[in-house]
């Protein structure tokens, strides 16, 4: 879905409005969208929040979606496969190149979870894709740690007006 109008309201309700009731319906929609991407024994993982942001927000909306999706598609999920090793500033208002620069090296595979992804296909899940910088950093971390393939799935995406 596009991240505008009702799509934006839905994502923000989950992200900042504690509307966890939207997780299951969103997971059903994500499961349909994920079907062409899914492989046997795929590992599903959310995009991580830095621990300080997690304390402030109290939950990771992408982790809630990843868990619900994994149940729906009967695949293993690992909520802490990835970690934010750097506390980055908010990406709001940054240009595309600034977003990629800010996230360079900011995400890595949890050292105690690396064994879960070696030689496996991984599906990374996030709530919104804006520039792709976060998903790119997470994908690179997974591939560098030995993932076979990495696919990405988001609930919404930002599209530029043309």
Regions found by a protein language model. Give the residues of each.
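PRPP/pyrophosphate-binding module of the type I phosphoribosyltransferase fold
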Residues: 71, 76-162
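Extended interfacial segments that mediate partner engagement and assembly in macromolecular machines
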Residues: 1-71, 92
């Amino acid at each position: 879905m596009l991240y505008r109008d009702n799509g934006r309201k839905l994502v923000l309700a989950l992200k900042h409005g504690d509307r966890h009731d939207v997780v299951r319906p969103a997971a059903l929609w994500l499961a349909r969208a994920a079907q062409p991407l899914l492989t046997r024994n795929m590992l599903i993982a959310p995009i991580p929040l830095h621990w300080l942001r997690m304390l402030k927000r109290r939950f990771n909306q992408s982790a809630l979606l990843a868990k619900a999706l994994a149940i729906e598609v009967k695949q293993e999920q690992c909520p802490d496969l990835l970690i934010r090793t750097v506390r980055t500033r908010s990406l709001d208002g940054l240009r595309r190149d600034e977003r990629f620069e800010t996230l360079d090296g900011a995400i890595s595979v949890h050292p105690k979870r690396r064994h879960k992804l070696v030689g496996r296909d991984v599906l990374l899940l996030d709530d919104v894709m804006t520039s792709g910088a976060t998903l790119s950093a997470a994908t690179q971390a997974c591939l560098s740690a030995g993932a076979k393939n990495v696919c990405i799935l988001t609930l919404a995406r930002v599209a530029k007006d043309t």
